[in-house]
Amino acid sequence: SGGFDFSFLPQPPQEKAGVGLGPGPMGLMGPRGPPGASGAPGPQGFGARGPAGPPGKAGEDGRPGERGVVGPQGARGFPGTPGLPGFKGIGLDGLKGQPGAPGVKGEPGAPGENGTGARGLPGERGRVGAPGPAGARGSDGSVGPVGPAGPIGSAGPPGFPGAPGPKGEGPVGNTGPSGPAGPRGEQGLPGVSGPVGPPGNPGANGLTGKGAAGLPGVAGAPGLPGPRGIPGPVGASGATGARGLVGEPGPAGSKGESGGKGEPGSAGPQGPPGSSGEEGKRGPNGEAGSTGPTGPPGLRGGPGSRGLPGADGRAGVIGPAGRGASGPAGVRGPSGDTGRPGEPGLMGARGLPGSPGNVGPAGKEGPVGLPGIDGRPGPIGPAGRGEAGNIGFPGPKGPAGDPGKKGHAGLAGNRGAPGPDGNNGAQGPPGLQGVQGGKGEQGPAGPPGFQGLPGPAGTTGEVGKPGERGIPGEFGLPGPAGPRGERGPPGESGAVGPSGAIGSRGPSGPPGPDGNKGEPGVVGAPGTAGPAGSGGPGERGAAGIPGGKGEKGETGLRGEVGTTGRDGARGAPGAVGAPGPAGEAGAAGPAGPAGPRGSPGERGEVGPAGPNGFAGPAGAAGQPGAKGERGTKGPKGENGIVGPTGPVGSAGPAGPNGPAGPAGSRGDGGPPGVTGFPGAAGRTGPPGPSGITGPPGPPGAAGKEGLRGPRGDQGPVGRTGETGAGGPPGFTGEKGPSGEPGTAGPPGTAGPQGLLGAPGILGLPGSRGERGLPGVAGAVGEPGPLGIGPPGARGPSGGDGLPGHKGERGYAGNAGPVGAAGAPGPHGSVGPAGKHGNRGEPGPVGSVGPVGALGPRGPSGPQGIRGDKGEPGDKGPRGLPGLKGHNGLQGLPGLAGQHGDQGSPGPVGPAGPRGPAGPSGPPGKDGRTGHPGAVGPAGIRGSQGSQGPSGPGPPGPPGPPGASGGGYDFGYEGDFYRA
């Protein structure tokens, strides 16, 4: 577990293992995981030693304890320098350090390059009504007047998704006017989309209601979609209103004549069921209900372009893919047959408008899959092109795009307790293991060893199935999710090695390749949504002190890539993000044959610009190539004010964005060219590789020197130094008292001179005292050899002399040569001992006499002056090596390196399957008018529609007559604005 490494403190000698204070906090970490259990400290582990105690008596050197098993722990700091093992003594154990503060939570990796819109907060879930059976398509009726849009209800609680009713397959009729949009309910959980049927002719876009999406009501029978206008610039998103309850669906339009029955599309695959809810049974395909009378048409919005796809935020729960209540429908333009959608590619130039024809019936919608667990939703895949409905509430979602790759993980911090966030998407394969740092040397106070390799990770379990979806917490504004990666295969688990010191975290590996997409599961009946889990996101742990940057570990071996995991359950679609940037236009489909020329509709009122994106060709009838006549409903002259939509039929589908509302009233539009399908948005490329991990920070400060190791064995004794110079001789001992002088005998005659004795050893000079009487002679030295000669006659003894007065003692003279000994006189009697004289000054040193016999050892003299230092003796043999010192304390971890720069975005991946159309973005600013496209072939003249009631807007100025017949393919140069 993270902590500060106090290894730089001085350590007391220890007999026991030091108390380990764990390694310091790492650098910025990802969210703090629950701390691993600490292993029991082994004897003499790496713990920091406390402050040194007083040195104990040197005991035996303790041997360093074994290393304790290190429990899994946060990243370790560098091992400190090993200290020398202290003598075994009684130092106190160091205080246990407090655990370091948890590391700062790492910043999340940069989001994948998703669209940029921020996601609104999803409202509460509304209850989803069960979709009723789809009515049969009505025949083309005249468009009734547009009813006013119903007020947006407040969001109801989310319901469980009903099972989708079967899609009716009546012939395609002309679209009846849509009823007014019910208030928008909350989005229910998304169902799995069925296969996308061939695109219908695009209907005019309804006005976008602001507000949360209502739960889809039961859909009335869809009218034929009118041609899709060229998207106007995307307006800024309106604020998300509260989700409305689902309004009652408007009455269905009257039943149109039957078109030929299209083949029903096969049901789309169901995504794997999420863990929540039991699957309900799929309802039988209902009979197509008859369509009710058409509600009044909504104001005609200019067809909006697809909004830019927003980045996915956290997905709100999307309701079942029932058709939502349509927003008030704009006046329908003539429908062109749509060509079948090509593979979505990049959007090419727009194709010439197809001729309006009947739309084949849409295939059945696939059953709604159970909502998957809410992973982080991947970006919405490119939409399959469904029948374009009026752009009102989103219709059923197309199949989900591939999940984007999971963004790179930030550095893992200590994980906080996981909040009730949804499960993460599948984890990419583990990044390469960081290199194991070299093990620091142990030695006395070596520099800190490099950090050991992380032991092989424990076996990675299979990625668990996503847990049940918790109740979504309040959604924060989700950041844009990176595209969801498919789950990488779990790496093989290595055996768990002993934990080395944990190396710094290696840079995250690149995201693993997307796993294969799992096979669609059997279509389950829609389950009921599980109860929402409670709990908001966990608290962010306190930021730890950033540890020093660890040395960069060596690159670990890359684990084997595990097998691709199954796709996780499909997450509930995220809340609709703000429209992302528009994808590049796909190549236009071939122009369909011109449809019969529809009769010019009345000039609808110019609705407020729908969420249409650019009011491109359908946009402002800026240049209304509109047929003037077609103006409001003039005869279908050239297309009505399709201003810029010259190409869109004569009637620009929308009058100038200006007064004419984004769509001028649609004259009889020549059929607007079918908008080429928007190319699928390319997949967001995988997130660029993580930035390079910044250079490792400087190594942490070296730990302080460890304790001194035990004393090595004593080396052999060196040779004795040379003897120092002798100290001065000790003082001479005091003389004994002199005997009393005997009476002198008469002097004998001098005998012949004896041989000179060897000079006696000089006595030490005595201190100069007063001269005493001469003492008795000291002991006789060994007699010299006898002088030869006959003994002289003994002289008479002299009389006693008077004692001399005590003179000062002179310095001792140098000893004169010894005279020849006189013949010994008779021994006088021993006189009384004289008084002890004071010590005389030392006489000068006489020459050295022969060595006398060893006398008894005198008392030790005072210590002599220290002699000069002798020469060093030879070096003794090397002592035994000392015991190995303890490991030094672990150094603090280095500071975390700076985050590397974000890697450049990876190459754009292949386009994924087209996702469902995103919700229309808010109306963008008007784009610049594009250049007129080439004139398409003339469409067949459509039947004249009856004039709708005048819309509330002022009529647009009549456009100049457009070319008659064919719509122009309108090239589109409008700038895309990011919403």
From Swiss-Prot:
GO terms for cellular component: extracellular matrix; extracellular space. It comes from the Eukaryota. InterPro entries: Collagen (IPR008160), Collagen_superfamily (IPR050149). GO terms for biological process: extracellular matrix organization. Its main location: secreted. Residues 1-979 are annotated as: Disordered. Residues 28-41, 128-157, 266-276, 490-507, 519-529, 570-599, 606-626, 644-654, 675-684, 738-765, 773-783, 811-833, 841-856 have a biased composition (Low complexity). Residues 627-636, 866-877 have a biased composition (Basic and acidic residues). Residues 256-265, 298-307, 434-443, 530-548, 664-673, 721-730, 784-802 have a biased composition (Gly residues). Trimers of one alpha 2(I) and two alpha 1(I) chains. Interacts (via C-terminus) with TMEM131 (via PapD-L domain); the interaction is direct and is involved in assembly and TRAPPIII ER-to-Golgi transport complex-dependent secretion of collagen. Type I collagen is a member of group I collagen (fibrillar forming collagen). These protein fragments were extracted from an ancient tibia bone collected in Haiti. Belongs to the fibrillar collagen family. This is Collagen alpha-2(I) chain.
